[in-house]
Amino acid sequence: VRGRCGLLPAITDFTVMVDQTSHMFITGPDVIKTVTGEDVGFEELGGARTHNTTSGVAHHMAGDEKDAIEYVKSLLSYLPSNNLSEAPAFPEEADLATTDEDRELDTLIPDSANQPYDMHTAIEHVLDDAEFLETQALFAPNIITGFGRVEGHPVGIVANQPMQFAGCLDIDASEKAARFVRTCDAFNVPVLTFVDVPGFLPGVDQEYGGIIRRGAKLIYAYAEATVPLITVITRKAFGGAYDVMGSKHLGADLNLAWPTAQVAVMGAQGAVNILHRRTIAAAEDPDATRAELMADYEDALLNPYVAAERGYVDAVIMPSDTGSTSSRGCVSSVRSGNPCLRRSTATSRCSHRPIRSPAHREVCP
């Protein structure tokens, strides 16, 4: 977007705006003032910052037109020319040896489950040359989306960000991730998901805003995707939020977990308070009893091995092995044959792959 416009950018796959130059709105400031009496300027109403941080309509805010063009060039390098073509790849020989840089991931997760860390570190260690092109970086920062390459092949990245809202999913994050997964599915780009999610963000505003309806968009996006889906659980994977983040239950092809992964309905404190409410209430020292029960719960359930035994996780790996393991899984899926028939889903209604755009259009030749 280089000037002023209205509705049409919303039906595109990606929208790039230039700060202080681009503006989008359905009704302009003059009409709004006449109808509602509100005083608002062009920049505040529909500027690049507004649509990148608040509305989520735009995917990137460029500093100038040159920056915008460079971003678009980078973006197009990950996408095919149409939804029936292969994504552009530059195959290179896999280097599966564990390096010192890979071993840095072994110390990424803090000892305290409540201490945040930057998920960008995990993402960049897995991608070729640590190159990651983020989309909608300023909108719903509690979830990360973007593109990178694994062994020269484009992949889409979806990841919870513990640095924001502890990685909780909310309305904006759910819709942001769902649209991105659908975009990857439409253009034959595999999806690599990093999970550290304690749940959906609680709150009256979230419930009134329709978190049930809008959060379900992420379920549909993953469940209907026909591209390879690879998921890595780094730490928390609790409740319904775990299910919607590319879980095995939604048909993901390869689900990996680090030893620090915690796969459960909820965290230890919440579970103990519900399951052992009467025991704690009757105890002489409720705090000590609660702490003991929490420790038992963590030892018995808050680990990836129970999930692995039940088939919810395919392998428990060291963080330093994430790059090589996900690389093998991703590339082998890409090389599996016809790019339009990578996975079989219950949504298929004919022999052709159901190709869905982010706007939920379906094209089946």
Residue ranges with predicted function:
Residues 1-356:
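Ligand-binding clefts of soluble mixed alpha/beta catalytic domains
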